[in-house]
C-alpha cells in the first residue's frame, strides 16, 4: 500500500518535530492492524500522555494505515468525509476507536460524528492537524511572543476548505503531560492531550472553537503528579471567582477609532505638560445600585470630566486580571488580560479609544516585581518554581506574601518584557508606571541581614532586575517612540530616568517620593511651627533636576490610616481647605510633572475606600466646589503656560527668589520657559496676610496676576491682591529692582512677567 495515499505519520518521528504529510489523503482499504498502543491508551486514560500525535489521528504502523480516535465516554464514532458515506470506527479499548481499511475514502480533511448517549456531536478531529506547530525561534523576540503564545485564532486550508479554530501554546518545560480542558470537553483532561514540542512548549489546535470559550490547562508535574488547573499565562480574557478560567478572545475584531491620536508626531515628553489623574476603576463612581461601572460606562462619565478638569492623562491602577479585588490590582495573575470585573477586552479598548478621541492619554500601573501564590496562576506552574527562585531569600516577598519573579531566567524576562509591549500594541496605551521598582533593584529590600543573598560581587544590587528593566525600557521606546515609562522608585538609585546608553535604567520619568514625603511632612505642621521645619520644604529643590520627576500625591498617601490629603492639613475646616489650596498651588508651581489621586480634586475628607465611590456629595458644599475649581484652573494654567512645564526637567527652568524666609514661612521662585517667559510664584504658608511685602526680581517689567488660590471663587478669604504690579527701582534680595505685593493668608499666587 502506498503511504502517499494517506497523511501517514511514523509514530517514532513525531515527538518533537512532526513531519509533513500529503495534502491529498486517501483511504483505499482498511486492513486489520495490530494493537501496539496499549501503553499509549493507559497514559491517555490518565491524562498523562505527552505525545498524542504518535497514537491519534491517521498514521502508518508496520506498513498498515489506520485512523485512531480517543473519545472517553462516547458510545459510537463515525468518520465523515465530504461526499462520502459515513464509516463507523470500531472500538479499540474502553475509550479508543479505530478505523480499519475497508473501502476507498478520499481523506484530505475529515470530521467525526460522535454519539454521546444518544446525542450526536460533529467534531473536527484536532489530531489530523500535526504540521502547524513549527518555528519557535521567533519566540526569542518579546515583541512576537504574545502573537503566538496563549490562545490564537487561526485559519488553515485543508482540501479546499478554510478551517478556523484556536491554536493553544503554553510553556511548561518540566511538565510530564499537559491537557487542554474547557467547556468544550466538559473539563475532561483525557479528551485533549497537548503535544510536547520544542523549547518546553506544548501545543494543540482545536478546530471550530469560537470566541468566549472557557478553558484552562491541566498539567502533570515532573513525576506525573496532578496539579491544580492553571489559567493561561498568556490568556487575553478570564473569568472571575470561582472558576478563574481563561476565555478565548480575538484581538483582531475591535475597530479602533483613534488613528489621529496614534499618528500624532513624536514629541519629547520631558517638555510637555503632563498632569496625571490616578484612578481606581472600581471606586471612582458606582452605579445607582452600588455596582461597578463597566469600562464603557466609565468612559462615558470619566472622559468628559477629565477634559473639563484639564488633566492630560488618566493613570489606571493595575487592570491586569487579579483574583483579590482588595489588592487594588497589585497582585495580578493574568498579566495579559484586562480584569473582567468591568467588562471584556473590547470594552477596555473602547475606554482607551474614547480617551484618545478626547485627547486624553492612558497610563497603566504595571507590576513586574512579584506575583501571588494563587493555585490557578504562575505559582509552581509546571510543578516546579518556573517563574520564581526556589530560595525564599530571593523568591519570596515577606511584605506582600507573594513570589518574586526570577529575572535571572531568560523565559521570565521575555514573559515580562513581552507583556509590557503587549499593552502598548494591543490596547494602544500611552505609558506604564512600573510599581515597586525599589523592591526589584535591591536584594536586601525590606529584609534583615540574614534573609538575603548577595550578588556575585557581594553587594545588594539585583543585577538581573537592573538588566531586565533596561531591556524593557529599550524595547518600549524602540517600538513605541511616543510612549513613556515611569518608575515608582523610592531610593537614591542613580540614573533611574537616564538613558541606558548613559548607564541609566532608561525610564522616561521617576516619581519624586522624596518631594511627596517632605512636602506633606511640612504642611502637616501647624503654621506656627512651620518655621522650624523650613528646610524640609526647600530641600527637595536640591535634587529636583537629578531625575525627570513626577510630583506624585498617589493612592499610597490616602490609605492605611494616613487619612486624606485634605485631612492632613492642620486647623479648623476653613484653614484645612485654605492650606490644601495653598499646597496644591505650591505643587503646581514646582518643577516636575503632576499626579493626583482621584478625590484630591474635590477635597475628599475620608480615607480612600475601594469598596465605595468617592465622596461626590461633598460638591454640595462651596468650599469643596472651590477646591475643584482651583484644581481645574491649575491644570489649565500648567498646560497653557510654557514656563510652567517646558523646562520641568532642567535647572534652567527654575530660579529661587526667596528661599530662606523661614520666620514668615514664605517661599518665592520663578519658572522660566525655553523662550524666556517668566512666572513668579509666591506661597504664604501661614494664616498671616502681608499688606506690603517686598520681593526682589531680576527683570524690569509689569507682573500680571494669573491665579490666586485665596480667591473667593475658590472659597478663599478674598484678601485683595494686586492684579497688576510694576517693578520699582528698590533694591531687595541683592537685586536692583523689586515688587511690592499684597500676600493673602495661606495662599499661592502666580504672576506673569510682561517686559
Curated annotation (Swiss-Prot):
Pathway: Glycan biosynthesis; glycogen biosynthesis. One of its GO terms (molecular function) is hydrolase activity, hydrolyzing O-glycosyl compounds. The active site is at 435 (nucleophile), 488 (proton donor). It catalyses: Transfers a segment of a (1->4)-alpha-D-glucan chain to a primary hydroxy group in a similar glucan chain. It comes from the Bacteria. It is an enzyme of class 2 (transferase). Keywords: Carbohydrate metabolism, Glycogen biosynthesis, Glycogen metabolism, Glycosyltransferase, Transferase. GO terms for cellular component: cytosol. Pfam families: Alpha-amylase (PF00128), Alpha-amylase_C (PF02806), CBM_48 (PF02922), GlgB_N (PF22019). One of its GO terms (biological process) is glycogen biosynthetic process. Its EC number is 2.4.1.18. Monomer. Catalyzes the formation of the alpha-1,6-glucosidic linkages in glycogen by scission of a 1,4-alpha-linked oligosaccharide from growing alpha-1,4-glucan chains and the subsequent attachment of the oligosaccharide to the alpha-1,6 position. Belongs to the glycosyl hydrolase 13 family. GlgB subfamily. This is 1,4-alpha-glucan branching enzyme GlgB. The lineage of its organism: Bacteria, Pseudomonadati, Pseudomonadota, Gammaproteobacteria, Vibrionales.
Amino acid at each position: 500500500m502506498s503511504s502517499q495515499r494517506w497523511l501517514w505519520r511514523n509514530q517514532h518521528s513525531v515527538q518533537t518535530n512532526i513531519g509533513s504529510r500529503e495534502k491529498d489523503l486517501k483511504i483505499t482499504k482498511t486492513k486489520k492492524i495490530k494493537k501496539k498502543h496499549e501503553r499509549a491508551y493507559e497514559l491517555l486514560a490518565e491524562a498523562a500522555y505527552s505525545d498524542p500525535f504518535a497514537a491519534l489521528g491517521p498514521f502508518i504502523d508496520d506498513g498498515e494505515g489506520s485512523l485512531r480516535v480517543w473519545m472517553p465516554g462516547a458510545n459510537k464514532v463515525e468518520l465523515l468525509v465530504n461526499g462520502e458515506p459515513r464509516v463507523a470506527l470500531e472500538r479499540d479499548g474502553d475509550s479508543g476507536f479505530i478505523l480499519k481499511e475497508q473501502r476507498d475514502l478520499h481523506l484530505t480533511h475529515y470530521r467525526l460524528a460522535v454519539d454521546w448517549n444518544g446525542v450526536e456531536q460533529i467534531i473536527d478531529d484536532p489530531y489530523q492537524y500535526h504540521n502547524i506547530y513549527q518555528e519557535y525561534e521567533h519566540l526569542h523576540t518579546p515583541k512576537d511572543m504574545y502573537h503566538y503564545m496563549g490562545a490564537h485564532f487561526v485559519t488553515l486550508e485543508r482540501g479546499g476548505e478554510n478551517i478556523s479554530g484556536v491554536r493553544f501554546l503554553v510553556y511548561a518545560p518540566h511538565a510530564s503531560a499537559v491537557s487542554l480542558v474547557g467547556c468544550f470537553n466538559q473539563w475532561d483532561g483525557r479528551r485533549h492531550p497537548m503535544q510536547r514540542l520544542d523549547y518546553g512548549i506544548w501545543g494543540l489546535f482545536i478546530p471550530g472553537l469560537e470566541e468566549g470559550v472557557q478553558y484552562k490547562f491541566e498539567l502533570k508535574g515532573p513525576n506525573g503528579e496532578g496539579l491544580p488547573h492553571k489559567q493561561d499565562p498568556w490568556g487575553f480574557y478570564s473569568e472571575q471567582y470561582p472558576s478563574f478560567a481563561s476565555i478565548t478572545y480575538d484581538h483582531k475584531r475591535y475597530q479602533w477609532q483613534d488613528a489621529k491620536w496614534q499618528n500624532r508626531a513624536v514629541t519629547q515628553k520631558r517638555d510637555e505638560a503632563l498632569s496625571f489623574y490616578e484612578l481606581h476603576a472600581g471606586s471612582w463612581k458606582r452605579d445607582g445600585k452600588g455596582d461597578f461601572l463597566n469600562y464603557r460606562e466609565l468612559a462615558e462619565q470619566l472622559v468628559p470630566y477629565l477634559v473639563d478638569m484639564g488633566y492630560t492623562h488618566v493613570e489606571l491602577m493595575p487592570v491586569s486580571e487579579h483574583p483579590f479585588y482588595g489588592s487594588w490590582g497589585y497582585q495580578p495573575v493574568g498579566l495579559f488580560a484586562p480584569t473582567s470585573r468591568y467588562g471584556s477586552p473590547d470594552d477596555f479598548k473602547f475606554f482607551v479609544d474614547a480617551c484618545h478621541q478626547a485627547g486624553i492619554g492612558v497610563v497603566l500601573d504595571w507590576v513586574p516585581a512579584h506575583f501571588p501564590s494563587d493555585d490557578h496562576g504562575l505559582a509552581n506552574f509546571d510543578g516546579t518554581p518556573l517563574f520564581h527562585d526556589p530560595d525564599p531569600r530571593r523568591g519570596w516577598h515577606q511584605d506582600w506574601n507573594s513570589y518574586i519573579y526570577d529575572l535571572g531566567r531568560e523565559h521570565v524576562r521575555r514573559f515580562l518584557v513581552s507583556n509590557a509591549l503587549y499593552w502598548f500594541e494591543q490596547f494602544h496605551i500611552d505609558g506604564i508606571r512600573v510599581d515597586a521598582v525599589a523592591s526589584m533593584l535591591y536584594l536586601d529590600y525590606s529584609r534583615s541581614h540574614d534573609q538575603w543573598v548577595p550578588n556575585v560581587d557581594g553587594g545588594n544590587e539585583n543585577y538581573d532586575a537592573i538588566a531586565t528593566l533596561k531591556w524593557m525600557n529599550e524595547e518600549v521606546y524602540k517600538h513605541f517612540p511616543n510612549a513613556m515609562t515611569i518608575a515608582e522608585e523610592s531610593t537614591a538609585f542613580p540614573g533611574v530616568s537616564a538613558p541606558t546608553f548613559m548607564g541609566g535604567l532608561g525610564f522616561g520619568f521617576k516619581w519624586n517620593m522624596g518631594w511627596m514625603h517632605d512636602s506633606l511632612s511640612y504642611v502637616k505642621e501647624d503654621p506656627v511651627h512651620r518655621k522650624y521645619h523650613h528646610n524640609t520644604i526647600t530641600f527637595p529643590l536640591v535634587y529636583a533636576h537629578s531625575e525627570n520627576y513626577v510630583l506624585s500625591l498617589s493612592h499610597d498617601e490616602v490609605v492605611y490610616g494616613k487619612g486624606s490629603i485634605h485631612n492632613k492639613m492642620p486647623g479648623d475646616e476653613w484653614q484645612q481647605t485654605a492650606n490644601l489650596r495653598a499646597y496644591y498651588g505650591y505643587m503646581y508651581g514646582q518643577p516636575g510633572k503632576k499626579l493626583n489621586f482621584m478625590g484630591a480634586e474635590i477635597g475628599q475628607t475620608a480615607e480612600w475606600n475601594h469598596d465605595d465611590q468617592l465622596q461626590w456629595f461633598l460638591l454640595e458644599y462651596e468650599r469643596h466646589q472651590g477646591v475643584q475649581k482651583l484644581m481645574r484652573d491649575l491644570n489649565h494654567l500648567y498646560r497653557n503656560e510654557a514656563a510652567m512645564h517646558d523646562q520641568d526637567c532642567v535647572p534652567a527652568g527654575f530660579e529661587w527668589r526667596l528661599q530662606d524666609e523661614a520666620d514668615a514661612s514664605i517661599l518665592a521662585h520663578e519658572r522660566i520657559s525655553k523662550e524666556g517667559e517668566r512666572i513668579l510664584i509666591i506661597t504664604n504658608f501661614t494664616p498671616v496676610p502681608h499688606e506690603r511685602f517686598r520681593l526682589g526680581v531680576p527683570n524690569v517689567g509689569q507682573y500680571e496676576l494669573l491665579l490666586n488660590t485665596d480667591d473667593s471663587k475658590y472659597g478663599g478669604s478674598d484678601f485683595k491682591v494686586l492684579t497688576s504690579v510694576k517693578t520699582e527701582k528698590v533694591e531687595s534680595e541683592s537685586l536692583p529692582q523689586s515688587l511690592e505685593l499684597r500676600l493673602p493668608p495661606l495662599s499661592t499666587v502666580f504672576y506673569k512677567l510682561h517686559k
